């Protein structure tokens, strides 16, 4: 029930921030103490645990959430942005200003993101990442990781928290 409440109160903002993974020099990430099999850090107390996509059942119960897609952090570092990509960055940083959307019980943040991008004709490219059993967002609005510096990439936030696992 707590998870349903969190989903009902979902406030999602996507931000272009940095992301990096430690490695062992052979292309395989190292597992740190406390990390799960997908190399994610423990989920803080009171936050929802990730759910394996293959274990989800989408129900009939509908909820609403607010979703937005922001690349505002690029505005502070435009000098790092590829010249060809600079024109794709909105002056106010919003690719999608906050909008309320409806989703069904069991749908993931990724499901909602796909729906909203499709409805708003906003380009989004992703790949499924078997090692993490989740979707990796490669680009939104034709802005991709590394387009604005070597540590740039897409992250998501739910209820003011950046989950350390894929959407």
Positions of PLM-derived features:
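Ubiquitin-like/PB1-type beta-grasp interaction modules and other compact soluble beta-rich domains
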Residues: 2-9, 18-167
């Amino acid at each position: 029930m707590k998870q349903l409440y969190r989903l009902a109160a979902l406030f999602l903002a996507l931000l272009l921030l940095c992301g990096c993974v430690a490695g062992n020099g052979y292309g395989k990430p190292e597992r740190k103490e406390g990390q799960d099999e997908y190399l994610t850090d423990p989920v803080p107390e009171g936050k929802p645990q990730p759910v394996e996509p293959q274990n989800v059942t989408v129900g009939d119960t509908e909820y609403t959430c607010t979703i937005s897609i922001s690349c505002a952090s690029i505005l502070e570092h435009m000098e790092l942005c590829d010249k060809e990509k600079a024109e794709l960055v909105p002056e106010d940083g919003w690719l999608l200003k906050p909008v309320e959307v409806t989703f069904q019980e069991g749908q993931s943040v990724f499901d909602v993101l796909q729906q909203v991008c499709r409805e708003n004709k906003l380009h989004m490219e992703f790949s499924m990442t078997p090692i993490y059993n989740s979707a990796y967002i490669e680009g939104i609005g034709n802005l991709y990781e590394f387009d604005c510096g070597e540590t740039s990439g897409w992250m998501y936030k739910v209820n003011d928290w950046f989950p350390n696992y894929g959407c």
